[in-house]
A protein has these predicted regions:
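Active-site and donor-binding regions of nucleotide-sugar-utilizing enzymes
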Residues: 1-61
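A donor-sugar binding/catalytic signature common to diverse glycosyltransferases
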Residues: 2, 18, 43, 168-191
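Phosphate- and divalent-cation-binding pockets in alpha/beta enzyme and binding domains
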Residues: 3, 53, 74, 112, ...
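Alpha-helical segments flanking ligand/cofactor-binding loops in enzyme cores
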Residues: 6, 33-34, 124, 172-173, ...
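Short, acidic/turn-prone active-site loops that include or flank metal/cofactor-
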Residues: 20-24, 69-70, 187
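Short active-site oxyanion
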Residues: 39-42, 62, 160, 178-180
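A nucleotide-sugar donor-handling region in carbohydrate enzymes
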Residues: 40-115
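Donor-nucleotide binding loops and adjacent catalytic segments primarily
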Residues: 81-179
Length: 191
């Protein structure tokens, strides 16, 4: 997004920015998002707070449109698959009606040195609960390898399914069945 916005600004090509004004505390994403906002011409925000935040950045109100999050519309397009088929696709048994936790935790870019310990705290909680848990790898930000190292210390738990990547069809269907989303991912908020 940053490169596109820079090129658009230098080439005098109008740029529309989606999700400007959204917040991620403790992550470099805020700085990048605000920079892209300042380089963009149209702002398609997901909520009223983001609208107000962009106004405070000095953008003109007629250039800001509260359109909501298009990711929500895309969720409706994802077909529902039953627990048996989902289990087959994952290679991990999901039982309809049983509690299910999804753990997605990413490194806080201002706390990279604490990534391993933070992941262990979440994994200790999951271990104590003993509930079926889907654990997704963190993103590729700095510190992610420390989190993955912590993940490996728990991957022998029989109720834990560790996935490097979960395809969208399976992920959305897991979220439909989840009793709890644990961690600091925006997936549960945005989707």
């Amino acid at each position: 997004a940053m490169t596109t916005a820079l090129v658009g600004a230098y080439m005098n090509i109008p740029v529309a920015h989606l999700c400007g004004g959204d917040r991620v505390i403790g992550n470099v994403d805020d700085q990048v998002r605000h920079a892209v906002t300042k380089l963009s011409h149209l702002h398609l925000v997901t909520n009223r707070e983001s609208f107000e935040r962009i106004l405070r950045l000095g953008e003109q109100p007629f250039r800001i449109f509260d359109v909501g999050n298009p990711g929500l519309d895309r969720l409706l397009e994802v077909p529902v698959i039953d627990a048996v088929k989902l289990s087959q696709r994952l290679g991990f048994t999901i039982v309809e009606g049983e509690p299910l936790v999804i753990l997605i935790q990413h490194v806080i870019s201002t706390e990279i040195d604490q990534a391993y310990e933070q992941m262990k705290i979440s994994l200790d909680a999951v271990s104590e609960l003993g509930i079926k848990t889907i654990l997704s790898y963190p993103n590729s930000d700095a510190g992610g390898q420390q989190m993955i190292r912590a993940n490996h210390e728990y991957d022998s738990l029989p109720f834990l399914y560790v996935a490097k990547n979960i395809p969208r069809l399976e992920f959305v269907n897991l979220m439909r069945r989840a009793s709890c989303l644990l961690g600091n991912s925006s997936a549960g908020i945005l989707e």
